[in-house]
Amino acid sequence: DYSANNKWMNELHLNMNADINDKTKFYGRLSMAKNWSQMGWSGTPYDLDAGRNTRSSGPVLYVDRAYLDYYITPEWIATVGRQPGTDGPGSNLRNNALRQSTYPALAINALGDAAVITYKPESLQDHKVAIRAAYGKTYQWDEEGKVRDWMSDQKDADANLYYAAVEGELPIEGMGDNLIIFNVAHMTDFALPLPGINLPIGPSGALVNVLQDGVYNLGNLTLANIHFENYNAFGTNFNYFVSLGYSNGTNAHTLSAIPAVQSQLEFNEKDGYAVHVGGRYDFTKTLKVGYEFFWGSRYWYTMSRPSINDPLNIRMTRGTAHDFYVIYQLDRYQFLRLSYTNIQNIWGNRGLPFGGAKKDKARADNIMLMYNVKF
């Protein structure tokens, strides 16, 4: 057991947008998240860009999102670039914000680059229907960080991400603003950087390298999600969301001939399930109180990473999580949020898609005060 108290952090978002012409629009965001007077930053980005831990980027700006929307017709839109893949539906209530991302947070809550085609049928715009298909990369070989490495030899395949979604508004009279999303993501050749492993072999106990440093393909991953949210439900001051998740690993790769090593690195070819629900009641325009509950099964895994708003990465829980928060709106541009989060993990290796999930008992508690300014 341990505790870490009196920790202070800053996060900065520099948002950009430009109407290039009637058909082309640009959106971007540069971000930084750092501890006060942070020490220990290495000066290099993580090997896997999509897995960047934005709790703390160090005192540097990084590209959070940068993409172009091109309106082929009023109904067909092409999008290319670094996607708005963080703080999506499912995080709006707690973040006291409007929709910040295309993708539900329980399915995709990470940095990533993709090409997307969106179809918004004019006949269904009263119900805000949008149909999307996307292709992206979550790992692409680049040994030295130079463009010429696109053409170099590589050991394992690039990881490819395919995504499809249908979203719209339920036509229920009096319900209020609502959003329902059905979406599925499939990743082939899921890749992660792994450290080298040396083990004593033979009577002499000499250390032998049984796994070299590098990026390895682990297997294929499928995620499915249904998300629903409702604001000012039926004319009240109550807002809520329900998000259901499913994950499944297949085609596990053999990484080592040593059984003891392979068992620790084996991709989980198992089904995983998750439920995330939350509600917030706005007593006044100034005072808002909310609660969220999360449950993740033994082998649950999704594309989520920690953030300054969620340092414990609640969506990776293998067990149960409870979050209570109070928002005090100072004025139109700024608010305070006091929150308490409790996570009870009953299965190990949370946040990892490999290595199994043995019975565990790990508790985490976090009390945090956030001051947020938007202008």
Features from the language model and the residues they span:
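Secondary-structure boundary elements
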Residues: 22, 71-75, 118-129, 168-179, ...
